[in-house]
Amino acid sequence: METTVLGVQPRIIKKNDAEKIRKSGNVPAVVYHKGEETVAVSVNELELNKLVHTAESHIIDLRFPDGKVKRSFIKAVQFHPVTDRIIHTDFQLFAADEVIEMDVPVSVTGESVGVDKGGKLQILRHNLTLKGKPTDMPDHLVIDITDMEIGSIVHVKDIPAQSYENLEIMIDPETPVVSVVAPKVEVETEEAPEAAAAPEAEA
C-alpha cells in the first residue's frame, strides 16, 4: 500500500473555530489512537481531497510542525450534505504490528461478456472493510468481471482469497459487491387518438 505525507496543524477547539478553518481552505480533523489523548488538528483541503477522492487507499504519515511524523489512515470523513465538501476527518494512528480495520476500495478488471451483450455493470459496494496488519493491506480489492454474464452477481464470498491474504473481510459473505443487470427495455406506447371534436351547440 502506498504511503503519503500530509502536513497537519494542531488547533485549539473554540466556538465557531471549525467554520473559520474551512473558510481558510483547511479542514478540521482529529487524530486519535487507542489509549492516547485525541489531538485536534487542521489539514489542507486540497491535499485531503487528493487522498479521499481516489481509487486507492493510503497509509498517511501525518507531519506535525515540530517535525514529528505519526503513521495513520483515514478512519472517517464527513461531507457537507449540499456542497459535498469535506467538513471533518478522523485519522487513526497505528503501530506496525497492530491489527486494524480499514476501508479498502473495490476495483474491477476485464471486459464483462454480459456488458458486451448490452448489460450494465453495477458496483454495489465501493469499499469493503478489511481487518489485519497495515503491512498486509492492499491498495484496492480487484474483482475480475470477464466471465460475468447478464444476471451474474459477485458476492463477498466469491472474491479470491489471494486478493486479501492474511486479512479478513468484515462483512457478511453473502453481501453482493458487483453485478451485471439486463438493460432496461423501453415500452413504446401508442399515441392516443385525438379526441373527437365536440359537437357545435345549436343556435
Swiss-Prot record:
rRNA-binding found in the keyword field: yes
InterPro entries on file: Rbsml_bL25/Gln-tRNA_synth_N (IPR020056), Ribosomal_bL25/Gln-tRNA_synth (IPR011035), Ribosomal_bL25_b-dom (IPR020057), Ribosomal_bL25_C (IPR037121), Ribosomal_bL25_long (IPR001021), Ribosomal_L25_dom (IPR029751), Ribosomal_uL5_bac-type (IPR020930)
Entry-linked SUPFAM superfamilies: Ribosomal protein L25-like
Entry superkingdom: Bacteria
Source species: Chlorobium phaeovibrioides (strain DSM 265 / 1930) (Prosthecochloris vibrioformis (strain DSM 265))
Gene this chain is encoded by: rplY
NCBIfam families: bL25_bact_ctc, PRK05618.3-2
Gene3D superfamilies from the UniProt entry: Ribosomal protein L25, beta domain, Ribosomal Protein L25, Chain P
Protein name per the record: Large ribosomal subunit protein bL25
